[in-house]
A protein has these predicted regions:
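C-terminal output/effector regions of signal-responsive regulators
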Residues: 122-126, 132-174
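Non-catalytic signal-transmission and effector/linker regions of two-component phosphorelay proteins
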Residues: 1-9
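Active-site residues of response regulator receiver
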Residues: 59, 84
Length: 174
């Protein structure tokens, strides 16, 4: 389990009650905190919004809303790990396209889940960090474009050199 002092919070969505209860017990015994359980994708989406888990573990085949369709919405809240008996290429591709971070095929053991859980959460955090960095760089680039346009206007209007117009902008901004 993660070395963080806080337990990783997990949402479990599985329509088969016995499998869901076994999974919850396995996760709890491994040191994870199961904050919500759902028997279908629609409830999983509601629970994800309500509890904001660190990870959602979803079965693919569930009533009402299937796991992959639910994952498409949950992915904006937390990373998703698919846990399913189905390994058909079409399902794996749908899960990949939905943004799922891991895909574990049943039967499974906790030894199969822990690495998938830890890697999914780690990759999700890395992606969020990169998204923040990209947004920051984009903002800085846009600011730079505005400054360059302002320099051009000053150079023309006040007959200044580029360094002089930049200095004028710096002094005026302070």
């Amino acid at each position: 389990m993660s070395t963080n002092s806080q337990k990783i919070k997990i949402l479990v969505a599985e329509d088969e009650t016995i499998i869901r209860l076994d999974l919850v017990e396995m996760l709890t015994d491994a040191g994870y905190e199961v904050v919500a359980q759902a028997e279908n994708g629609a409830i999983a989406i509601e629970m994800a919004k309500k509890y904001q888990p660190d990870l959602a573990i979803l079965d693919v085949k569930m009533p009402e809303v299937d796991g992959i369709t639910a994952a498409e919405q949950i992915i904006s809240i937390s990373p998703v790990l698919m846990l399913t008996a189905f390994s058909q290429r079409e399902l794996v591709e749908r899960a990949r396209d939905a943004g799922v971070m891991a895909y574990v095929v049943k039967p499974f053991s906790i030894g199969d889940l822990v690495p998938a859980i830890e890697i999914a959460i780690s990759r999700h955090r890395q992606m969020k960090t990169l998204e923040t960095e990209v947004a920051d760089l984009y903002e800085r680039l846009e600011t730079r474009k505005i400054i360059d346009r302002a320099k051009g206007i000053l150079m023309k209007a006040m007959n200044l050199s580029e360094p002089e117009s930049f200095n004028w902008i710096q002094k005026t901004a302070m």
